[in-house]
């Protein structure tokens, strides 16, 4: 409990931002879902054959896995809030549509006949008594949709839309139960709170509706005002990072250097998502800058990657030239360390089987159970390369990055993919095997920025290049250890390093 409280207060500003983002996503999605579903239900009461088909279709929408739906929407809409809102609206349609339709079609026919006898038009019947009588059903549908939206909105963090899911993802990535509890409990509490609020409005009278509408308006308006205030400065730069401690440390270094050496104000978006999300966000102007790796550029982003030897400078020049030509992006000078892919095993396992190189795994391949990330499994410089160059066909389980370390520590797998600067290598007493067939290209970290942004703020090149050739693998691994294992704040770790190297006052 003490750790939970300390984590909460240490991250209270991030928490407030995530809570506001979560509420915005939920409110906007619920509003759009209600504006679509309620009028549609009214229309369907006069077209009952069509109603059955549409209810089945909206019901099918709810069976689509949320991650799959987000994945389908990304190529069409992009990343960030738009696809998250569309997905949440799709999930919320069915309960509101079904309940509204049920409420309107179960009104006593004798009341309908009496209304017609009094000469009421369809519009008059609808607004004078039908909606009033169906209101408990409508509110019930909205309550169900609200709980569904607030819970599902945690997945929005996977595509850079923010929300309380960022705490859950970060907690999983860093094996930090406090962060997971903060995100999960807050989401659950928010769902309960709004469920109660809507239940209070269920017994609606004019006064309650006015109060409820005013509170909702103030919350929405206040949250947007907060966002506007935090992003209203003229010289504003948004820097994002991938999941994990290392990108978090690096972007905090960028922020500290930029704000000390210029009048540009920096907004950070740590744990923004995986590689392709950040790359697409940069191209669509949702972010201005993020740290990327030279090997990733060659293997993932370039449409026609050149065949290169594994010399770091050669790979950097090819990555820089390729991005400039293909997307008009600028890859600034790289840091010294290489956070390359590696194959890791427990030290005791390596000693028992005399493993020093990846090729040594061939002699015990039938005993191996591998835990690889999905990205590693699908990459040419990952498991595909292990199959082609090392002729390794293993029993492979796909895992999230943080979970594979827990799996090898618990003996559930005995070989994993890793990054050479991961703090978990030291934490769990793992060793990396020599890449004796030179499968993995160099992965030097460097700032990736739109050329247009660099033209707008030309001073950024000189500022960010202060890190060029700096940070060894040992130093980066130690900083990762301080954040992941010792629980230090990434911004403090970043500033301490910069001060130690006389890059920051």
Curated annotation (Swiss-Prot):
Source domain of life is Bacteria
- Classification via Pfam families: BPD_transp_1, OpuAC
Q: Which InterPro entries match?
A: ABC_Gly_betaine_transp_sub-bd, ABC_transp_perm/SBD, MetI-like, MetI-like_sf
Q: Which residues cross the membrane?
A: 25-45, 59-79, 84-104, 148-168, 178-198, 209-229
**Disulfide links within the chain:** none
Q: Keywords on this record?
A: Membrane, Transmembrane, Transmembrane helix, Transport
**Could you tell me the membrane topology recorded for this protein?**
Multi-pass membrane protein
GO MF term list = amino acid binding; transmembrane transporter activity
Return the annotated region ranges for Ergothioneine binding domain. Answer: 231-505
Q: Which GO terms describe its cellular component?
A: ATP-binding cassette (ABC) transporter complex
Where it sits in the cell: the answer is:
Membrane
Q: What is known of its domains?
A: The transmembrane domain (TMD) and the solute-binding domain (SBD) are fused. SBD binds to ergothioneine (EGT). Probably undergoes significant conformational change when bound to EGT.
* Role description: Part of an ABC transporter complex required for the uptake of ergothioneine (EGT), a natural low-molecular weight (LMW) thiol antioxidant. Responsible for the translocation of the substrate across the membrane. Also contains a C-terminal periplasmic solute-binding domain (SBD) which binds to EGT with sub-micromolar affinity.
Q: Which family does it belong to?
A: In the N-terminal section; belongs to the binding-protein-dependent transport system permease family.
This protein's name: Probable ergothioneine transporter EgtUBC
**Gene name of the record:** egtUBC
């Amino acid at each position: 409990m003490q750790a939970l409280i300390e984590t909460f207060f240490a991250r209270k500003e991030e928490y407030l931002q995530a809570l506001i983002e979560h509420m915005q996503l939920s409110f906007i999605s619920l509003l759009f879902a209600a504006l679509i579903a309620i009028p549609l239900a009214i229309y369907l009461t006069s077209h009952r054959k069509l109603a059955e088909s549409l209810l089945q279709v909206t019901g099918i929408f709810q069976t689509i896995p949320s991650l799959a739906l987000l994945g389908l929407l990304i190529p069409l809409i992009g990343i960030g809030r738009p696809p998250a809102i569309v997905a949440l609206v799709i999930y919320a349609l069915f309960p509101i549509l079904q309940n509204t339709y049920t409420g309107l079609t179960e009104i006593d026919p004798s009341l309908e006949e009496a209304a017609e006898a009094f000469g009421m038009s369809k519009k008059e019947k609808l607004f004078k008594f039908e909606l009033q009588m169906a209101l408990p059903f409508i509110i019930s549908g909205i309550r169900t949709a609200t709980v569904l939206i607030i819970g599902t909105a945690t997945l929005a963090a996977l595509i850079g839309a923010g929300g309380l899911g960022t705490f859950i993802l970060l907690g999983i990535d860093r094996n930090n139960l406090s962060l997971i509890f903060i995100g999960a409990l807050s989401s659950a509490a928010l769902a309960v709170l709004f469920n109660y609020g809507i239940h209070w409005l269920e017994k609606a009278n004019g006064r309650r509706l006015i109060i409820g509408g005013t509170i909702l308006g103030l919350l929405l308006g206040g949250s947007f005002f907060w966002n506007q205030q935090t992003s209203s400065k003229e010289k504003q730069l948004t820097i994002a990072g991938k999941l994990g401690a290392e990108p978090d440390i690096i972007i905090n270094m960028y922020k500290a250097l930029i704000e000390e050496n210029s009048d540009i104000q920096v907004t950070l978006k740590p744990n923004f998502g995986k590689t392709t999300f950040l790359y697409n966000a940069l191209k669509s102007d949702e972010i201005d800058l993020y740290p990327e790796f030279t090997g990733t550029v060659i293997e993932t982003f370039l449409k026609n990657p050149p065949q290169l030897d594994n010399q770091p400078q050669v790979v950097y020049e090819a990555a820089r030239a390729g991005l400039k030509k293909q997307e008009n992006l600028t890859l600034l000078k790289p840091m010294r360390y290489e956070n390359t892919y590696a194959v890791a095993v427990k030290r005791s396992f390596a000693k028992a089987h005399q493993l020093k190189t990846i090729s040594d795994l061939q002699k015990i391949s039938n005993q191996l159970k591998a835990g690889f990330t999905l990205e590693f499994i699908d990459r040419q410089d990952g498991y595909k390369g292990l199959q082609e160059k090392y002729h390794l066909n293993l029993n492979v389980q796909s895992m999230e990055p943080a979970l594979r370390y827990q799996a090898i520590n618990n003996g559930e797998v005995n070989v994993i993919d890793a990054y050479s600067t991961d703090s978990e290598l030291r934490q769990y007493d793992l060793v990396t095997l020599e890449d004796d067939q030179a499968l993995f290209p160099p992965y030097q970290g460097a700032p990736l920025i739109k050329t247009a942004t660099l033209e707008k703020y030309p001073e950024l090149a000189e500022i960010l290049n202060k890190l060029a050739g700096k940070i060894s693998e040992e130093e980066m691994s130690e900083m990762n250890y301080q954040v992941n294992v010792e629980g230090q704040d990434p911004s403090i770790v970043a500033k301490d390093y910069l001060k130690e190297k006389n890059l920051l006052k």
